[in-house]
């Protein structure tokens, strides 16, 4: 048995492994952790906003707020610790993080703004977990099956199918979010996606609704 952050799984599955369960998804949105309790729009022009994600850099640039993306590395605590730190120590005015990671670490109190997907679409699969086992291990697969959430599985499958169709990896500047919604003929999937460019070129945003099948 292996449990992963689903957004980090390769789009092409390993032939010997089974994705036995995708549990209910944590909040998939991105958040801002900023000094002085500021929101993204309240940061002054030229403020440094830390992120290690090309997807976030491209969408942040597209918002036209005049802030400066700053490349950062490290775990969640390291990144949060950079907020308000001296510039000589790599400090920034704010960082962009996945809400799910902070919730799982019980660090939601540091969040100063939860970003609407209209501003910042998350990575495909963000907020979801993947439970894998060996494809021939029926006993483990049956035990894991009770954890599976069909709505979450269908949503992340749509997001990852988009990523595979674009032949993009998990580090590409691609955001996607699918949700199960009620349509005229029952449940449907609503998929929103963005393909960005870290050079500042215009992003491409599209949305579509279709059958869960």
Task: Place the predicted regions along the sequence by residue.
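Short, Asp-centered acidic motifs that coordinate Mg2+ and/or phosphate
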Residues: 1-3, 93-94
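Fold-independent oxyanion-binding glycine-rich loops
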Residues: 4-7, 22-23, 35-36, 52-54, ...
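A conserved helix-loop-strand patch within extracytoplasmic ligand-binding domains
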Residues: 6-67
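Small-molecule-sensing regulatory modules
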Residues: 62, 66-213
């Amino acid at each position: 048995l292996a449990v992963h952050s689903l957004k980090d799984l390769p789009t092409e599955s390993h032939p010997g492994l089974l994705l036995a369960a995708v549990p209910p998804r944590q909040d998939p949105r991105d958040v801002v952790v900023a000094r002085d309790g500021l929101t993204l729009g309240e940061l002054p022009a030229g403020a440094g906003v830390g992120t290690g994600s090309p997807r976030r850099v491209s969408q942040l640039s597209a918002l036209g707020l005049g802030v400066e993306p700053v490349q950062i590395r490290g775990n969640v605590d390291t990144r949060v610790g950079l907020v308000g730190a001296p510039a000589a120590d790599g400090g920034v005015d704010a960082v962009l993080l996945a809400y799910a990671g902070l919730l799982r670490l019980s660090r939601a109190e540091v969040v100063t703004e939860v970003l609407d997907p209209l501003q910042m679409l998350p990575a495909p699969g963000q907020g979801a977990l993947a439970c894998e086992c060996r494809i021939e291990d029926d006993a483990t697969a049956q035990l894991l099956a009770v954890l599976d959430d069909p709505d979450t599985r269908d949503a992340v499958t749509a997001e990852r199918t988009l990523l595979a169709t674009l032949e993009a990896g998990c580090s590409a500047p691609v955001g996607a979010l699918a949700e199960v919604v009620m349509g005229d003929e029952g449940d449907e999937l609503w998929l929103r996606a963005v393909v960005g460019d870290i050079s500042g070129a215009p992003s491409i945003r599209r949305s579509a609704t279709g059958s869960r099948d």
